[in-house]
Each structure stands twice: as structure tokens, then as C-alpha cells.
Amino acid sequence: MRINGQLTMGENIADLAGLQVAYDAYHASLKGKPAPVVGGMTGDQRFFLAFAQSWQDKSRDDSLKQQMVSDPHSPSNFRVIGPTRNVDAWYAAFGVKPGDKFYLPPEKRSRIW
């Protein structure tokens, strides 16, 4: 099955905007101080990991098929990788580079603001 981009576009844009606003708010909360490394992970890595974990779910195939034809929200796994691969900070946080599975060249990344 394929995701209907016409159906999900508005919510996909909202997901990207929300992720960017949350990331900016996280950095504002640091007040210029570096986030501590915890468990070997930087603050930015923990931020993106928490974002991804917030979308964890388990769906039955029938439910997923129904969602893809009637719900304006993309399935949860796409609500993670879709926005994150459009945020430059995600690349820096995890060292994502050309040739990596989810790499998207800068000129193809969506910019909301």
C-alpha cells in the first residue's frame, strides 16, 4: 500500500513544524548551556530519540490499511522519519551522511519557515 500524500499533506506539514518548534524550544530551555551527555547520548540525540519513541505503536494490517485510505495522518513510522529527515539538526546529531538509508540532500529537505 502507498500513503495518499494528498490526504496526509496537511498533517505531514504540521508534524514537521511541530518537531522544529519543539527542537527550538528545547534549545531555548538550555539557555545557551550545553546539554549533558547521558548514557553516551547527546542532548540532541535524546531529543530525537524521545520524539521517535513517542510514535511507537503496533497496528494490525487491517487497521493500517483502513488508516491509509481514510485518516489524514500518516502511519506512525512515517510520522517519525518523514519530519526528522527534513531537520538539519537530526543529521548532525547522528552523523547521517550521503549514502545512509534515510539521507535526504539539503536541497530536497522541506522548509516550513
Locations of regions flagged by a protein language model:
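Zinc-dependent metallohydrolase catalytic domains
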Residues: 1-113
